[in-house]
Every structure is written in C-alpha cells, then in structure tokens.
C-alpha cells in the first residue's frame, strides 16, 4: 500500500458519522441516524401542547400611561373565557365522550324501540335514535302565547291557515309549511309582548326562511312581500329574518310532524321494500292515505292544543284515526299509553273531517305526479277547526248533564249507617 493510500484509509476511518461518504459511483450517502419513533412522538406532542396553550390565551392591547400627558401601547396575554354552548348542536359537539353524550337525553328515549326493519344497505336503527333524541332536545312549549297579552289562539290559527293558502299558491311542500309553523311557535315562545301588528310579518318571514331551506326553487323575496298586500316590505322581511334566526339560535332543522308521518308511512310498506333487489328506494306508500292523514294534521296544527304533544305523538295519533291501533303501534314503536291522550283529543277533529268529507289527492301543473301528495293544499282548515271546536263544546255539555256511570253492582250501605231522615 502506498503512502497516499494509507492516508486516505485513515481519513475514512476517522470520518464522523454525521458526514456524508461517497460510494463507488460518487453518490453521497448520509450515515446520520434517524430519529426514533419516541422522539417523533415527543415532537408532535410538544407542538400540540403549544397549540393548545395558545388557544387558551388571547392577546389584548392596552395603553399604559407613562406620564400625565402620554402613554404607550403594550400587549397582555389574557386567559380566554370558556364559552357555554348556546344551541343543542353546540352542546352535542361539546361532549367529550359517549357517556356524556348519552346523559344529555332523557332516559325514556332509549326505551323506545325502533320499528324500522333491518335492511342490508344502511344502519337504520341509528337514524331512528337520532330522530328520537333530537325531538327530546327540542320540547314544545304549550304556553307560547302566555307572554303575549295582545295575541290570542284565534290569531295564531288565522295566521297558520293563511300560510297554508300561500303554500298552495306557490306550490310549496308540506315540509315548508310545518317548518314555518315550528319557527313561529318557537319564536313566540322566546319573545315577550309581541304586538299583533307584527304577527303577519313573523309568519311570512318564517315561511321565507323555510322555503329557502326546503324548496329547490323557492319564491323570490318580492313574491313573499306581494302576498301580504303591502303589509310587509322586502326590507322588513330581511330585518325580521335576521332577528328570527338569532332568536332561534340558528336551529332550523327540527324533526317536524310531516317528517314523522313520512317515516311511519314508509315503515308500513317495509316488507315490500325489503324484497326489492335495488339498493336505492323511493317513498313507497299510498298517496291517498297520506293526504287523509295530512289533512287531519293540518287542522290539528291550527289548534293551540297541539302544542301539548310531541310531533311524533301527533303523527302517530293521526295515523291511528286513519288506519287502526295494531298498525299504528307496530310502525311507530310506541305504546298505547303514549298516544291515548292525543288520540282522545284528536277524535273530534277526525269525526268532523269524516262528516264533511276527506281530502282528495290534487294534481298540479308542472309537478311530478308521484310528488303531488307532498305539496301543501288548503282544504278549508279554519272552517273545520271551528266545527271541531263546536263539537267539543257539545260533548262537554253532554258529559256534564249526563249522570256519572259507575261500573259494577252498587252495594247498599250498612243498616246502622243509613240516614234516618225521612223515616216515619
């Protein structure tokens, strides 16, 4: 080995590991050790910790006086205040684990079994659970008019009946009307001393918001203002829209009575759906029966007494009056005790409709025939409401005048406890 070769060999032997050496093709090759997995994990956790700490503080600019006539600007780190969730959606997102999430809901909700059959293409029991829990998070307030001395039950009925007419004129879906009715009731429950002069503005604004949510081609703003006959302008509707959205905390997707009715009617045909080979299913139920049940719900919604019941109970009770008890309990997952009170309250409305005549399916121009039953129609709902109230009054008078019927055989009192009055 030559003297030069010996020096090169000793140089390569003493070369540190952090330097790069060359192979026979003169390509650099790094010999530095890679970071271990523990080191990488530590680095990521430190970065996350720094980011978490940054989110706990905010920078606040302040002026610090240095003399009587001058001051300098400085910055301070101020801890951020924890914002409480203001809506049910934020409350759900704020939960840390499943146990906390589950404890947000009443215990009776989980006891309600899902009537939806198990199909191979989706986890339908989970859908049912979400629907029941969402309804439990948004209870209805039956005393929504209590804090409004200038408003009455009749005014609310007239407003909702007028909204039904507007929906039929513009070919709006039933879901749009029931969303608007829900917005009106929730808005009145959250406000106080609303004057009767603003009631029409509240109603048309609710329908304006609902149409934008539900309809593919909702009517224009000026069309909603036009149907008020000059009572509401475009600017007033826009201003009221912002007020209403803030009052409702932007919770605009309740499970309406129309949604429950569609679900129950679809479950009635579960066997037919399960036998199909396709994975995509359209709504499959009788349009005529759906319209009859929807007519009963339209009339009942005008009555303030409907606020005493949840939407699912109203839909199940209306289905009971059109079908029978066996079908209703099987497709709703409810028990008779759950719907008994609502069925009894709704009986006068059902009798009135049977006397006057049930609604028939209407066909609309430029509306697909298979979707015609979903278009909101006006069937003299206010007149049916008045007749139902008259029937309720007559039934109350008859029950007060009739003697009390005591079941079983009456047992006479003992001889020593009989009254001596009138004995000769």
UniProtKB/Swiss-Prot annotation:
Q: Name any one Pfam family assigned in the record.
A: Cyclin_N
Specify whether Acetylation is a keyword of the entry: no
> What does UniProt give as GO cellular component?
nucleus
Q: Where is this region: Disordered?
A: 1-25
Q: Which GO biological process annotations does it have?
A: cell division
Q: Which keywords describe this protein according to UniProt?
A: Cell cycle, Cell division, Cyclin, Nucleus, Phosphoprotein
Question: Which compartment or compartments is the protein found in?
Answer: Nucleus
Q: Where is the composition biased (Polar residues)?
A: 7-17
Q: Report the residues modified as Phosphothreonine.
A: 411
Which spans of this chain does the record mark as coiled coil?
A: none
What interactions and quaternary structure are annotated? Interacts with a member of the CDK2/CDK protein kinases to form a serine/threonine kinase holoenzyme complex. The cyclin subunit imparts substrate specificity to the complex.
Function, as annotated, reads: Essential for the control of the cell cycle at the G1/S (start) transition.
PANTHER family listed in its UniProt record: CYCLINS (PTHR10177)
What the record says about family reads:
Belongs to the cyclin family. Cyclin E subfamily.
Name of the protein described by the UniProt record: G1/S-specific cyclin-E
Q: Which organism is it from?
A: Hemicentrotus pulcherrimus
